[in-house]
UniProtKB/Swiss-Prot annotation:
Residues 17-163 are annotated as: Disordered. Homodimer. Homodimerization is required for transactivation. Interacts with host ALYREF. Associates in a complex with RNA, and host export factors NXF1/TAP and ALYREF; these interactions allow nuclear export of viral transcripts. Interacts with protein K-bZIP/K8; this interaction promotes viral gene expression during lytic infection. Interacts with host PABPC1. Interacts with host AGO2 and TNRC6A; these interactions inhibit host P-body formation. Interacts with PRKRA and EIF2AK2/PKR; these interactions inhibit host stress granule formation. Belongs to the HHV-1 ICP27 protein family. Disulfide bonds: none annotated. The record marks 33-34 as: Cleavage. Proteolytically cleaved by host caspase-7 (CASP7), leading to its inactivation, thereby preventing expression of viral lytic genes. It comes from Human herpesvirus 8 type P (isolate GK18). This is Post-transcriptional regulator MTA. GO terms for biological process: positive regulation of viral life cycle; regulation of DNA-templated transcription; symbiont-mediated suppression of host PKR/eIFalpha signaling. Induction: Transactivated by ORF50 protein.
């Protein structure tokens, strides 16, 4: 009976051990926690387990323990495992977007404002391939050094003012001005007594009388018609004549243009018209001069600036007037290429502002005229260049001789028309259009123009 009770207690202990060591137990046998001081204080004295009581009873009765049983280790309080949560892969949290990760973080409020200073703007540098013709005395091309935007300290401002004053002082010394024209500290800046206010309002400026005109009689009806057409303003279509007709009337025309009777009158009349006319009128004068010079050369003649010729005597004046009017255009808008614009500006400066026609001719002789603006100016400078051929270079003489040979009536006006038409078909700038209208003028005011040639 006693043995049966012992066996039941042993089986009960084995079942308890199997339940405690199963995989569903929340504690592990190999992970035990040592009891703390608080646990010892709070815990009450527990009764010994049943197997210890049985073991004590057996030892007291002299019964040996079973051989196949392993003594159980004392288990302390084990740490509870964290609960395992099963989440669906469809409901997993998404990773932050890389855009927000690398984007600029915006903070609202005054405390989070960005205090980083804005980046400084770097000065624009001019491309090194841009060439400009400097205003030299020889008319050759020179490369201007690129201007760099540098900040000078305020200390150098006084030094710069001193340099300017010194330069002005040197220029005044070169002019050799009298002491009465030099300003001092107490003298007035200008003399108001020389203003003629006592004459009253002035509606017209005094103009000297033109040279006298002596009537001339020609037996040729065509020559008479040309002279009558040159004495009035009219449309260019009413003054048209073929180049073959001019070649046929060469002898009669030569006797008229080289006559001394009315040479001063006609030259004065043509200069007045050229000074007040636009590019259309001046282009018509250039067409007339080129056709007449071509006719003279074809008949074995030649011309020089000392010879008397009513048509060719005004060639230099017409050239200066044409280039001056041409500068009124918005050249930077009309010519978009930097090389073309540089050549146009330099030639225009030499002719119109510097009065250095020979240097402009030499410059044109050294470049290739592969654009319309340069070829137009070359045609305008052809007659003045041929008249000054003894002063210009050999390349310049060859250029103008070739242009005079290959010229056809209508080339000058055709180039001018195409330049304006092609540009303003794309340009919508109102200032450019206004400048073009002012520079072109009207072709009706052409007194002094004898004929307009046609091919």
């Amino acid at each position: 009976m006693v043995q049966a009770m012992i066996d039941m207690d042993i089986m009960k202990g084995i079942l308890e051990d199997s339940v405690s060591s199963s995989e569903f137990d929340e504690s592990r046998d190999d992970e035990t926690d040592a009891p703390t001081l608080e646990d010892e204080q709070l815990s009450e004295p527990a009764e010994p387990p049943a197997d210890e009581r049985i073991r004590g009873t057996q030892s007291a009765q002299g019964i040996p323990p079973p051989l196949g049983r392993i003594p159980k280790k004392s288990q302390g309080r084990s740490q509870l495992r964290s609960e395992i949560q099963f989440c669906s892969p469809l409901s997993r949290p998404r990773s932050p977007s890389p855009v927000n990760r690398y984007g600029k973080k915006i903070k609202f409020g005054t405390a989070g404002q960005n205090t980083r200073p804005p980046p400084e703007k770097r000065p624009r540098r001019r491309p090194r391939d841009r060439l400009q013709y400097g205003r030299t005395t020889r008319g050759g091309q020179c490369r201007a050094a690129p201007k760099r935007a540098t900040r000078r300290p305020q200390v150098n401002c006084q030094r710069q003012d001193d340099d300017v004053r010194q330069g002005v002082s040197d220029a005044v010394k070169k002019l050799r001005l009298p002491a009465s024209m030099i300003i001092d500290g107490e003298s007035p800046r200008f003399d108001d007594s020389i203003i003629p206010r006592h004459h009253g309002a002035c509606f017209n400026v005094f103009i000297p009388a033109p040279p006298s005109h002596v009537p001339e009689v020609f037996t040729d009806r065509d020559i008479t018609a040309l002279i009558r057409a040159g004495g009035k303003d009219d449309e260019l279509i009413n003054k048209k004549i073929s180049a073959k007709k001019i070649d046929h009337l060469h002898r009669q025309m030569l006797s008229f243009v080289t006559s001394r009777h009315n040479q001063a009158y006609w030259v004065s009349c043509r200069r007045e018209t050229a000074a007040a006319g636009g590019l259309q009128t001046l282009g018509a004068f250039v067409e007339e001069q080129m056709t007449w010079a071509q006719t003279v050369v074809r008949h074995g003649g030649w011309f020089d600036e000392k010879d008397i010729d009513i048509i060719l005597d005004t060639a230099i004046f017409v050239c200066n007037a044409f280039v001056t009017r041409f500068r009124l255009l918005h050249l930077s808008c009309v010519f978009d290429k930097q090389s073309e614009l540089a050549l146009i500006k330099q030639v225009a400066y030499l002719v119109a502002m510097g009065n250095r026609l020979v240097e402009a001719c030499n410059l044109l002789g050294e470049v290739k005229l592969n654009f319309r603006g340069g070829l137009l100016l070359a045609f305008v400078l052809t007659i003045p260049g041929m008249q000054s051929r003894r002063s210009i270079s050999a390349r310049g003489q060859e250029l103008f001789r070739t242009l005079l040979e290959y010229y056809r009536p209508g080339d000058v006006m055709g180039l001018l028309n195409v330049i304006v038409m092609e540009h303003h078909s794309l340009c919508r700038n109102s200032e450019c259009a206004a400048a073009t209208r002012a520079a072109m003028g009207s072709a009706k005011f052409n007194k002094g123009l004898f004929f307009y040639p046609l091919s």
